[in-house]
Amino acid sequence: MRAAIIGAGRIALGLAAERLHRSGYEVTVLGRGSVSAALRLCRAVEVELTDGWETERFLVPVRTVDLADRIAAVKSIASADVVGTAVGARTLPAVLDLLAEGLKRAARPVNVIAFENHENAARIIRKGLRMRLGPGVDRHGFTGAVIARAVAHRVFTEDGHVRVVGDPPSEVVIDGLALVDPVPLVRGFIPVDDFRAYYRRKLYRFSAGHATT
Protein backbone atom coordinates (compact mmCIF):
# COMPACT_ATOMS: atom_id res chain seq x y z
CA MET A 1 0.00 0.00 0.00
CA ARG A 2 1.19 3.49 -0.82
CA ALA A 3 0.44 6.90 0.65
CA ALA A 4 1.46 10.35 -0.57
CA ILE A 5 1.40 13.40 1.69
CA ILE A 6 1.43 16.89 0.20
CA GLY A 7 3.28 19.01 2.74
CA ALA A 8 6.22 18.44 5.08
CA GLY A 9 5.14 20.37 8.15
CA ARG A 10 4.56 19.26 11.72
CA ILE A 11 1.25 17.46 11.22
CA ALA A 12 2.36 15.93 7.91
CA LEU A 13 5.44 14.38 9.50
CA GLY A 14 4.44 14.03 13.15
CA LEU A 15 1.00 12.53 12.60
CA ALA A 16 0.09 11.62 9.02
CA ALA A 17 3.38 9.97 8.01
CA GLU A 18 3.78 8.26 11.39
CA ARG A 19 0.26 6.80 11.48
CA LEU A 20 0.32 5.67 7.84
CA HIS A 21 3.73 4.03 8.24
CA ARG A 22 2.60 2.16 11.35
CA SER A 23 -0.36 0.88 9.34
CA GLY A 24 1.82 -0.65 6.64
CA TYR A 25 1.89 2.12 4.05
CA GLU A 26 4.96 3.12 2.07
CA VAL A 27 4.91 6.88 2.65
CA THR A 28 6.07 9.52 0.19
CA VAL A 29 6.30 13.12 1.40
CA LEU A 30 5.95 15.90 -1.17
CA GLY A 31 7.75 18.95 0.19
CA ARG A 32 10.23 21.63 -0.74
CA GLY A 33 13.34 23.45 0.42
CA SER A 34 15.69 22.45 3.23
CA VAL A 35 13.18 20.12 4.90
CA SER A 36 12.67 18.17 1.69
CA ALA A 37 16.44 17.97 1.16
CA ALA A 38 17.05 16.68 4.70
CA LEU A 39 14.31 14.07 4.43
CA ARG A 40 15.65 12.90 1.09
CA LEU A 41 19.17 12.59 2.51
CA CYS A 42 18.17 10.75 5.70
CA ARG A 43 15.25 8.81 4.17
CA ALA A 44 13.38 9.14 7.46
CA VAL A 45 11.86 11.62 9.88
CA GLU A 46 12.61 11.43 13.59
CA VAL A 47 9.42 11.48 15.66
CA GLU A 48 9.41 12.24 19.38
CA LEU A 49 6.20 11.73 21.36
CA THR A 50 6.06 12.87 24.97
CA ASP A 51 3.42 13.38 27.64
CA GLY A 52 5.77 15.19 29.98
CA TRP A 53 6.68 12.06 31.92
CA GLU A 54 7.60 9.50 29.29
CA THR A 55 9.22 10.08 25.92
CA GLU A 56 9.32 7.80 22.88
CA ARG A 57 11.64 8.59 19.98
CA PHE A 58 11.81 6.63 16.72
CA LEU A 59 12.46 6.93 12.99
CA VAL A 60 9.68 6.82 10.40
CA PRO A 61 10.98 5.83 6.94
CA VAL A 62 9.76 8.10 4.15
CA ARG A 63 10.43 8.65 0.49
CA THR A 64 10.67 12.30 -0.49
CA VAL A 65 9.80 14.11 -3.69
CA ASP A 66 10.46 17.81 -4.11
CA LEU A 67 7.38 19.67 -5.30
CA ALA A 68 9.59 21.35 -7.89
CA ASP A 69 9.80 17.98 -9.66
CA ARG A 70 6.29 18.09 -11.08
CA ILE A 71 6.48 14.80 -12.97
CA ALA A 72 7.63 12.84 -9.92
CA ALA A 73 5.07 14.56 -7.68
CA VAL A 74 2.20 13.71 -10.04
CA LYS A 75 3.41 10.12 -10.29
CA SER A 76 3.51 9.78 -6.50
CA ILE A 77 -0.11 10.90 -6.22
CA ALA A 78 -1.28 8.77 -9.13
CA SER A 79 0.24 5.62 -7.65
CA ALA A 80 -1.05 6.18 -4.09
CA ASP A 81 -3.93 4.43 -2.37
CA VAL A 82 -4.28 7.32 0.08
CA VAL A 83 -3.32 10.97 -0.41
CA GLY A 84 -3.04 13.42 2.47
CA THR A 85 -2.82 17.19 2.39
CA ALA A 86 -1.19 19.08 5.25
CA VAL A 87 -0.37 22.50 3.86
CA GLY A 88 -2.77 24.76 5.75
CA ALA A 89 -6.30 25.57 4.61
CA ARG A 90 -5.27 28.88 3.01
CA THR A 91 -2.69 27.09 0.87
CA LEU A 92 -5.03 24.39 -0.44
CA PRO A 93 -5.88 26.28 -3.67
CA ALA A 94 -2.17 26.25 -4.56
CA VAL A 95 -1.99 22.43 -4.61
CA LEU A 96 -5.26 21.69 -6.43
CA ASP A 97 -3.70 21.61 -9.91
CA LEU A 98 -1.10 19.08 -8.75
CA LEU A 99 -3.72 17.00 -6.97
CA ALA A 100 -5.97 17.05 -10.04
CA GLU A 101 -3.15 15.90 -12.32
CA GLY A 102 -2.32 13.01 -10.01
CA LEU A 103 -5.90 11.86 -9.49
CA LYS A 104 -6.62 12.09 -13.21
CA ARG A 105 -3.84 9.56 -13.82
CA ALA A 106 -4.79 7.27 -10.93
CA ALA A 107 -5.76 3.79 -12.08
CA ARG A 108 -8.07 3.24 -9.09
CA PRO A 109 -10.19 5.29 -6.68
CA VAL A 110 -8.15 7.26 -4.15
CA ASN A 111 -9.16 8.53 -0.71
CA VAL A 112 -7.90 12.04 0.03
CA ILE A 113 -7.57 13.05 3.69
CA ALA A 114 -7.24 16.76 4.47
CA PHE A 115 -5.20 17.18 7.68
CA GLU A 116 -5.95 20.90 7.71
CA ASN A 117 -7.77 21.64 10.99
CA HIS A 118 -10.61 23.14 8.97
CA GLU A 119 -14.22 21.98 8.96
CA ASN A 120 -14.68 22.48 5.22
CA ALA A 121 -11.23 21.46 3.95
CA ALA A 122 -12.52 18.37 2.14
CA ARG A 123 -15.34 20.39 0.60
CA ILE A 124 -12.87 23.01 -0.64
CA ILE A 125 -10.74 20.31 -2.26
CA ARG A 126 -13.68 18.52 -3.87
CA LYS A 127 -15.13 21.77 -5.25
CA GLY A 128 -11.78 22.82 -6.67
CA LEU A 129 -11.16 19.43 -8.24
CA ARG A 130 -14.64 19.30 -9.78
CA MET A 131 -13.74 22.45 -11.71
CA ARG A 132 -10.67 20.63 -13.03
CA LEU A 133 -11.83 17.01 -13.37
CA GLY A 134 -15.59 17.33 -13.85
CA PRO A 135 -17.56 14.16 -13.01
CA GLY A 136 -14.28 12.24 -12.70
CA VAL A 137 -13.90 13.63 -9.19
CA ASP A 138 -16.78 11.46 -7.98
CA ARG A 139 -14.82 8.21 -8.08
CA HIS A 140 -12.54 9.48 -5.32
CA GLY A 141 -13.21 10.05 -1.61
CA PHE A 142 -12.54 13.27 0.30
CA THR A 143 -12.57 13.70 4.06
CA GLY A 144 -11.33 16.15 6.61
CA ALA A 145 -9.65 15.08 9.84
CA VAL A 146 -10.29 15.87 13.50
CA ILE A 147 -6.86 15.44 15.08
CA ALA A 148 -6.22 14.74 18.76
CA ARG A 149 -2.42 15.05 18.61
CA ALA A 150 -0.61 18.37 18.94
CA VAL A 151 2.75 18.53 17.15
CA ALA A 152 4.50 21.55 18.59
CA HIS A 153 7.97 21.55 17.03
CA ARG A 154 9.85 20.72 13.84
CA VAL A 155 13.61 21.12 14.12
CA PHE A 156 16.85 19.96 12.51
CA THR A 157 19.03 17.70 14.65
CA GLU A 158 22.83 17.87 14.82
CA ASP A 159 23.12 14.78 12.61
CA GLY A 160 20.90 16.29 9.92
CA HIS A 161 17.59 14.60 10.64
CA VAL A 162 14.28 16.40 10.70
CA ARG A 163 12.73 15.91 14.16
CA VAL A 164 9.10 16.58 15.05
CA VAL A 165 7.92 16.68 18.65
CA GLY A 166 4.32 16.03 19.68
CA ASP A 167 2.11 14.40 22.26
CA PRO A 168 1.06 10.72 22.13
CA PRO A 169 -2.69 10.73 21.23
CA SER A 170 -3.18 9.00 17.89
CA GLU A 171 -6.93 9.28 17.30
CA VAL A 172 -8.02 10.91 14.05
CA VAL A 173 -11.73 11.18 13.26
CA ILE A 174 -12.56 11.03 9.55
CA ASP A 175 -15.82 11.22 7.60
CA GLY A 176 -16.80 7.62 6.95
CA LEU A 177 -19.64 8.62 4.63
CA ALA A 178 -17.25 10.50 2.33
CA LEU A 179 -14.83 7.62 1.74
CA VAL A 180 -14.78 5.23 -1.21
CA ASP A 181 -13.84 1.56 -1.30
CA PRO A 182 -11.35 0.32 -0.41
CA VAL A 183 -11.63 2.33 2.82
CA PRO A 184 -8.14 2.98 4.25
CA LEU A 185 -7.42 1.03 7.43
CA VAL A 186 -5.14 3.29 9.43
CA ARG A 187 -4.36 2.67 13.08
CA GLY A 188 -6.07 5.30 15.22
CA PHE A 189 -8.28 6.62 12.40
CA ILE A 190 -11.98 6.46 13.29
CA PRO A 191 -14.62 6.76 10.52
CA VAL A 192 -17.83 8.41 11.77
CA ASP A 193 -21.22 9.25 10.26
CA ASP A 194 -21.44 12.81 11.61
CA PHE A 195 -18.04 14.35 10.98
CA ARG A 196 -19.20 17.93 11.46
CA ALA A 197 -20.45 17.18 14.98
CA TYR A 198 -17.04 15.77 15.95
CA TYR A 199 -15.25 18.77 14.51
CA ARG A 200 -17.45 21.23 16.38
CA ARG A 201 -17.05 19.26 19.61
CA LYS A 202 -13.28 19.57 19.27
CA LEU A 203 -13.60 23.28 18.55
CA TYR A 204 -15.80 23.78 21.62
CA ARG A 205 -13.46 21.86 23.90
CA PHE A 206 -10.43 23.76 22.62
CA SER A 207 -12.11 27.16 22.95
CA ALA A 208 -13.64 26.38 26.34
CA GLY A 209 -10.29 25.18 27.65
CA HIS A 210 -8.58 28.41 26.66
CA ALA A 211 -11.42 30.51 28.03
CA THR A 212 -10.90 29.06 31.51
CA THR A 213 -7.09 29.42 31.61
What are these model-predicted stretches?
Residues 1-4, 10-11, 16-213:
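Substrate/ligand-engaging "lid" and interaction regions
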